[in-house]
Amino acid sequence: MPTLVTILLLAACAAVGTEPLPGGPPHHVQGGFRNTNPEFRRPDGWTRTRFLLSRAWANTFDSRSFEAPRVANDGVALRSGAGPGNPGPTITWVGHSTLLVQLEGVTLLTDPQWSERASPLSWAGPRRLSPPGLAFEVLPPINLVLISHDHYDHLDLDTVKRLAAAHDPLFVVPLGLKSWLAGQGVTRVQELDWWGSLEHQGVRVVCVPAQHFSQRSLWDANTRLWASWAVIGASRRLYFGGDTGYFDGFRQAGERLGPFDLTALAIGAYRPAEIMRFTHTTPEEAVQAFEDLRGRILLGIHWGTFDLSEEPLGEPPERMLAEASRRGIPPERAWILKIGETRYW
């Protein structure tokens, strides 16, 4: 146990520089990246270590069970709807932050995660509570994959390799992940800095600032950038938040790129607040972010799939819908999908 505590403490304290590089963007620092919100604070190393230990214990010896509502989806409609002749844009919740989006002939995935655990270890770490809403084998042809950051619940290397082998999509990632993926044998990758963009098969993809952090090992904290994504077609605009705390970046994205037809925002992993408050949104903050983004439809994601935090596992959608109702947002504009559910947007 002392060795484990030492390892976790080192992981919690590992960091890059904090001062912006002369002449560079304000989020670039020596050896990596930082959040630019002057109010941003990360908990001290001991607080993070205590949390990591408590989560390791809970996931190993005191795991909670929960299964989010789900519907069967054999992928037939999605496969028949792929391509330029589809009847309209669709979105399918596979689970956690994994969405399958069909828009104007492009079929894309966000933060694809089909593994049993969100962990570097096959035998430990957060276990999937609900199977994916689509079996990997029934996916339609995937043209594009967006990855928000390198945490294991968002960048699952086994899934990425399977997608590269089976579909050969273009992976679009924040700065620093292209070389890392190349080292894993995944080479069809383009990386972007905040506010950078590219065109792919007629849709525009924009890398949007987020307030979070990155880390996959003891020594690489914040060496790779984190981001949200905007996907802009001729008829629809999608905002995918990935992981982010609430900050002024939502308002900026709404002003520069909005209004958005659909905003997919994380509503889970917000307790304890001393750990989560700057890097994850509460359900109420997600509703505020939706309004900042000038959204038409709010979709709550990042809940009910992995046990990552301490709030009741079924609480996030209840709080999101209650806050949306309190603000006068009608039910047809505040969505909680069942795992596997597809809707037109």
Show which residues each predicted segment covers:
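Active-site metal-binding motif and surrounding structural segment of the metallo-beta-lactamase
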Residues: R48, W123-V172, R188-Q190, G258-A264
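Metallo-beta-lactamase
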Residues: C13-V138, P174-G242, D261-G268, R319-E341
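Bacterial N-terminal signal peptides
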Residues: P2-A12
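Cap/insert and terminal regions of metallo-dependent hydrolase folds
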Residues: A14-F40, F136, L144, H151, ...
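A short acidic, amphipathic alpha-helical/loop segment
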Residues: D158-L163, Q184-G185, G249-A253
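Acidic/histidine-rich helix-loop elements
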Residues: P112-P132, F213-D220, R271-H280, D307
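Catalytic core of the metallo-beta-lactamase
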Residues: T98-E104, E199-D261, R277, T281-E285
